[in-house]
Each structure stands twice: as C-alpha cells, then as structure tokens.
Amino acid sequence: SYADMMKNKELFDICAITGLILGEKAENTNYRNIAIMTDADHDGLGSIYPALLAFFSNWPELFEQGRIRFVKTPVIIAQIGKTQKWFYTVAEYEEVKDTLPKHSIRYIKGLGSLQRDEYKEMIQNPVYDVVKLPENWKELFEMLMGNDPELRKDWMLG
C-alpha cells in the first residue's frame, strides 16, 4: 500500500527530493533526470535493484523516457605521470593495460576510496549509462514481478 511504501525512509526521501508522488505519473518532477550512483563493486551494484524496482513499478514512464541513469563509478584508476585514466570495469582495464605507458593502479573499493578531487570530478562531470528497456518490458515485468508464479517457474526452468 501507499502508506507502507512511505514508511521506507529511502523511498520517502527520494520522493521528497525528486517531487515524485506515489500513484501519480512523473510529470512535474523537480529534476528532468534521476541519476543513481553506487559503489562499482558487487555490493554497490546489488543495491541498485531495489531502487530500480521501486522506480519501475511506480513510474515506468521514467524508463520509457530515458530519464533513469546510472553514474558510472571507477573500479580502477591508473596513474600515468600526472594524469589519471579511469576504468569502470576490470575488463576495460585488462584490455588496454599493456598498451598504457608506465603506470600505477589503484583499486577503488567504494566511493569512499576516492580522493576529494576525484569525487568532485565525478560529481561535476558524470559519465552516465541510461537505462534502456526492451520493447517487451511490460511482459517481462509481469512475468518476473506479477502474481502468477507459474510464469516465473517456466522462465527459470527454460
């Protein structure tokens, strides 16, 4: 119910900040887009899903309009002389590490691992991934989150 959802402090705060109102379309929000920023590790990425589910189940139009974005956060920062190169996945770094000039790397375990100037750079010049939905998103949502467990079982069992 609406009352139960508003008891969730995080969801309540998000609604208060963004101007989103449960039960209403996201038409008159305080911001054009909503950017989600978490640690790039498995824990941080795992925390995205409850937020996405809350947005998706209440305001799917935000996804249809490309208004939900992730702020990409670095996993590795390579120091090459006085310049830095940020990598958002280990695979991205592994792909080019042998072509980089002599460098040192620092693994970023979370946003708290960033130095103040790095954090400022990420806030002032964010790199976004826009969440895009497949055309059959309504069917998928109903299958995965709907009231018919047989649909989920069929999907999981292939």
Describe the residue ranges of each PLM region:
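Conserved phosphate-chemistry cores used by DNA topoisomerases
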Residues: 1-158
